[in-house]
Amino acid sequence: MFALPQAGDRRGEIIKVLLSNGWDYMNGLLTLGKVGEPQIPTPEVLTKILVELGPFYIKLGQLLSTRPDLLPPRYINALTALQSNVPPLPWSAIEDLLQREFPQPLGETFQEIESEPIAAGSIGQIHRAVLQSGETVAIKVKRPGIDVIVEQDSLLIKDVAELLALTEFGQNYDIVKLADEFTQTVKAELNFDTEAAYTNNLRTNLAKTTWFDPNQLVIPKVYWELTNQKFLVLEWLDGVPILTADLTQPPSDKDIAEKKKEITTLLFRAFFQQLYVDGFFHADPHPGNIFYLADGRLALIDCGMVGRLDPRTRQLLTEMLLAIVDLDAKRCAQLTVELSESVGRVNFQRLEVDYERMLRKYYDLSLSEFNFSEVVYEFLRIARVNKLKVPACLGLYAKCLANLEGAG
């Protein structure tokens, strides 16, 4: 056996958190290199550990919540609710950062910047500001030092993955590749140029739609000349999260039920286009990221997490949903194998039986009674228990559907 290479104070901090929460398996792995089949603590303890370990691990947990092909439902549910409790940085630190590193001189760019953030997270915080032109904008500022922390934690995750690769679990799930995917995704979120590009792509795609009235759905405009890796400046949208919105405003001749139906239809059409036409979608449309604007339009915000579906995957997913509606267990099993990234020896009979059991609950339901996010999560669970590796994009696809059902 061998132990992990030293990683300075950060490694010691991690071991202290693991010891205080009683995760003996991971503590043994980090200190002595003891390799055995992974033993995961309860969902509650795992989320507590991730929060205490800080921004990188919070993001890691949020990414794991999109992978029901890797973890059982109770872990997915706990990780989905994972939120950072990071206090905002004081205005003095933000102001100093803006003065030193903002792309343009502050006095020439802004009339004012509000010192109190409107939101703060593990990677950055957002301040409202007014440009010299009179336009109101949102400035997202990256936390100083976050890059160094993420780089250190990424190296530790890589070392842990190389140890876990010696286990059956690690081999079944190609754990080294998986760890690399996760760390690259977190690092991408640190680059606000990337989020700006995602935002702009969604805005462009949805502006030219024929599936709905593009004037009714807003994606914030990016101010490219004021945006770089550390700062993201977006159009300010005056609204509130959809679930707290007063749908009687602005006044109209439509009642609440009609407005709710219009909103549901608009969201369905917007995401149908993203998922099945464009293959590029906002992967985190929870109710807090769908705003009801003062003028009655909808807006999608926080476009930092996106998913991609290639044409073949989109076609297979469509066929899978049709097979489930038709209660065709054999076809579901065939499509699961086709969607898998790599297939060793598959017990096809067992796979088909798993689908027969799953489909029983849908025998007497009409199409309108189907919970399609639950259906996709079931499909990913079946893939997991049959040791079939599916593309990571399918986890984001399932998360997107689940969030939409929560918003609607």
From Swiss-Prot:
SUPFAM superfamilies: Protein kinase-like (PK-like). Transmembrane segments: none annotated. InterPro entries: ABC1_dom, Kinase-like_dom_sf, Prot_kinase_dom, UbiB_kinase. CDD domains: ABC1_ADCK3-like. One of its GO terms (molecular function) is protein kinase activity. It comes from the Bacteria. Belongs to the protein kinase superfamily. ADCK protein kinase family. This is Uncharacterized protein slr0889. It comes from Synechocystis sp. (strain ATCC 27184 / PCC 6803 / Kazusa). The lineage of its organism: Bacteria, Bacillati, Cyanobacteriota, Cyanophyceae, Synechococcales.
